[in-house]
A protein has these predicted regions:
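Start-transfer (signal-anchor) and selected internal transmembrane alpha helices
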Residues: 1-23, 99-104
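Transmembrane-helix motifs of polytopic, lipid-linked glycan transferases
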Residues: 78-100, 136-140
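Short hydrophobic/aromatic helix or loop-helix immediately within or flanking a transmembrane segment
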Residues: 48-82
Length: 145
C-alpha cells in the first residue's frame, strides 16, 4: 500500500497545482476588473518618464498592449497569468523531484509558500512573483543537474 501511494504523489501534486492555477486565474480575472486594485499600478511602472528601475515589465506591457491593440489592463492580466502559471508549474517540476524528502514537502505545502498568494488576496498579482520565479528556476536547474 505504501508503494502505491508513493507512486501517485506526482499526480496528486499535479492536481493540486492545477487547482491552484485555476483558482489563481479566476481571482486574477476578478481583480483586474476592479478599479482600485493596487497591484495593477505596480505593473505599470515604465520608461516613459525616463529611465526608472523596475520599469522594464511596465514598458513591455505597454508595448504589448499597443502592438496587439489590447486594453492595458488586459495585457497586464495576461502577463500576470503567464508568470503565475509558469511559477506554479516550475514548483510542480521541483515537487516531482523531492518526493522522498518529507520536510521539504511539509514546508512547500505550508500556507506561507504555495497558498500564500491565493490566501492573501492583496499580495496576489504583484511583481514579486518574478523574484519567486527566478528562485524556483534556480532550484529547478540545480535539482536537474
Amino acid at each position: 500500500m505504501q508503494n502505491k501511494t508513493n507512486n501517485n504523489w506526482p499526480s496528486y501534486y499535479l492536481y493540486y497545482i492545477l487547482m491552484l492555477v485555476f483558482f489563481g486565474v479566476f481571482i486574477l480575472y476578478y481583480k483586474h476588473d476592479v478599479g482600485n486594485d493596487s497591484t495593477i499600478s505596480d505593473w505599470l511602472i515604465n520608461y516613459s518618464g525616463g529611465f526608472v528601475r523596475r520599469g522594464l515589465i511596465g514598458q513591455l506591457a505597454i508595448e504589448f498592449s499597443n502592438f496587439f491593440s489590447f486594453k492595458l489592463r488586459d495585457s497586464i492580466l495576461m502577463f500576470q497569468i503567464f508568470f503565475f502559471t509558469i511559477y506554479y508549474f516550475f514548483v510542480f517540476f521541483i515537487l516531482r523531484k523531492v518526493i522522498e524528502n518529507r520536510l521539504i514537502i511539509l514546508s512547500i505545502f505550508s500556507p506561507i509558500f504555495i497558498l500564500y498568494p491565493i490566501a492573501e488576496i492583496e499580495a496576489f498579482g504583484r511583481k514579486e512573483i518574478l523574484i519567486f520565479l527566478i528562485i524556483v528556476s534556480y532550484f529547478l536547474v540545480n535539482i536537474q543537474n
